[in-house]
Swiss-Prot record:
It holds the Pfam family Histone_H2A_C. This is Histone H2A.1. The modification Phosphoserine is found at residue 123. The modification N-acetylserine is found at residue 2. The modification N6-acetyllysine is found at residues 6, 9, 11, 13, 18. GO terms for cellular component: nucleosome; nucleus. The keyword DNA-binding applies. It comes from Tetrahymena thermophila (strain SB210).
Length: 133
């Protein structure tokens, strides 16, 4: 038997190599494969490039991290350890860019921003400096 030919070792991948997900390759937490599948099944285009789902996953992960950080700060300001929809709403509405991005979005159980028109507040009267008799 000769050592060359079809009976040799498999070329390319070694036996010890493991599969690495596209998310891990890109250094992301969001699932690149699932986003790719959604893009293909959604019929947004006839063809989807290989970089498109990676880029979209990165953008979605960044936005989620930004909202979660601001919502965590809002929860901490209210002395809470759990983020609730109210904290997410406060985070989005108090940030200028996120508010512009999510202007037409309603968050369930989020409530509204506290806002009282200054005209409706009681007027501040000047206190006299003279002592009363």
């Amino acid at each position: 038997m000769s050592t060359t030919g079809k009976g040799g070792k498999a070329k390319g991948k070694t036996a010890s190599s493991k599969q690495v997900s596209r998310s891990a390759r890109a250094g992301l937490q969001f699932p690149v494969g699932r986003i790719s599948r959604f893009l293909k099944n959604g019929r947004y285009s006839e063809r989807i490039g290989t970089g498109a789902p990676v880029y979209l996953a990165a953008v979605l992960e960044y936005l989620a991290a930004e909202v979660l950080e601001l919502a965590g700060n809002a929860a901490k300001d209210n002395k809470k350890t759990r983020i609730v929809p109210r904290h997410i709403l406060l985070a989005i509405r108090n940030d200028e860019e996120l508010n512009k991005l999510m202007a037409n979005t309603t968050i369930a159980d989020g409530g509204v921003l506290p806002n009282i028109n200054p005209m409706l507040l009681p007027s501040k009267t000047k206190k006299s400096t003279e002592p009363e008799h």
